[in-house]
Amino acid sequence: MITISNATEDDIPDLVKLLNILFRQEKEFDENPELERKGLSAIISDPKTGVIIVAKENQKIVGMVNLLFTQSTALGSRVGIVEDMIVSITSRAKGVGSKLMTRAMKLAKENHCARITLLVDRDNLQAQHFY
């Protein structure tokens, strides 16, 4: 059974592993576990910045997505940015990504976001097809 929750500091080592899978696919990023840990910790420790949502199967993290908050000058209100969506290879095609996105959209609404912007790399055709 897949459960969806907000990430905690204890989840960071597993999140770094997932990010490294993602960054191997994205040409513009290099793996840097130290910086990844720092960024993850900054988001997790400050709910005003955003939230990292995780999917767990049998208590093991199998997916994640970041929902970051910022202010839109065009809309004059808070907006959400969704990025770093990754599901482990063995957990794909099981609805994990859909559950993560559903939670991200729900949290964006609960946090009064006027819109959500999704970031996906131009050459990540698999992700574009999913969305």
Stretch-by-stretch model annotation:
Residues 101, 108-119:
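Conserved GNAT acetyl-CoA-binding A-motif
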Residues 98, 110, 122-131:
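Conserved active-site alpha-helix within GNAT-family acetyltransferase domains
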Residues 69, 117-121, 128:
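Conserved catalytic-core motifs of GNAT/GCN5-like acyltransferases
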Residues 87, 93-106:
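Conserved acetyl-CoA-binding loop-helix of GNAT-fold acetyltransferases
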Residues 6-12, 17-77, 83, 102, ...:
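Acetyl-CoA-dependent GNAT
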Residues 7, 85-87, 120:
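Hydrophobic adenine-recognition pocket in adenosine-nucleotide-binding enzymes
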Residues 70-72, 90, 123-125:
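Short coil/turn motifs at secondary-structure junctions
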Residues 2-3:
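Extreme N-terminal starter segment of soluble prokaryotic enzymes
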